A protein has these predicted regions:
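Compact nucleic-acid interaction/catalytic patches
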Residues: 26-28, 33-67
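C-terminal terminal-subdomain/extension
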Residues: 69-136
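Short, charged beta-turn/beta-strand-edge "cap" motif at the junction between a beta-strand
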Residues: 18-22
Length: 136
């Protein structure tokens, strides 16, 4: 059965990330939806970044969002730990992260994924053309 909830980029939910090894975030925790809204509407999965309240070593892939958005504690988005989860593992809506914070998250993602600024400019300027091209 298709999940009928509406998921939007920038929304924060509680989700079950399951059990993971090592330093990867796991368990029931807040996650930030990163995936575009078309993917959110039609896919059975979501691309998310886990959020932690633990003090972490300051990295360029971390975005401090505090507690001003409705999060219970001072929080950090961990863009170096993005993951894809099934919508059935997503539970309670918590809050929405505003555009300014999402821009900071986007910059952290660019850093995390090693995408150069000129590559980003090229993608933004030709995104419609890229969708039309078929890769053989």
């Amino acid at each position: 059965m298709k999940d009928r909830r509406i998921f939007k980029r920038g929304f924060v939910y509680y989700a079950d990330l399951g059990y993971n090894y090592g330093s990867k975030q796991s368990g029931y925790r807040p996650v930030l939806v990163l995936q575009n809204n078309i993917g959110n509407k039609y896919s059975n999965t979501l691309i998310v970044a886990p959020i932690t309240t633990r003090d972490k070593k300051i990295l360029p892939t971390h975005v401090y969002v505090g507690d001003k958005y409705g999060l219970d504690n001072d929080s950090i988005v961990l863009t170096e730990q993005i993951t894809t989860i099934d919508k059935s593992r997503v539970f309670e809506y918590i809050c929405y992260i505003d555009n300014n914070a999402m821009k900071m998250v986007e910059k952290a993602l660019i850093t995390s994924l090693g995408i150069s600024s000129c590559a980003c400019d090229m993608l933004y300027n030709s995104s419609n053309e890229l969708h039309r091209k078929r890769i053989n």
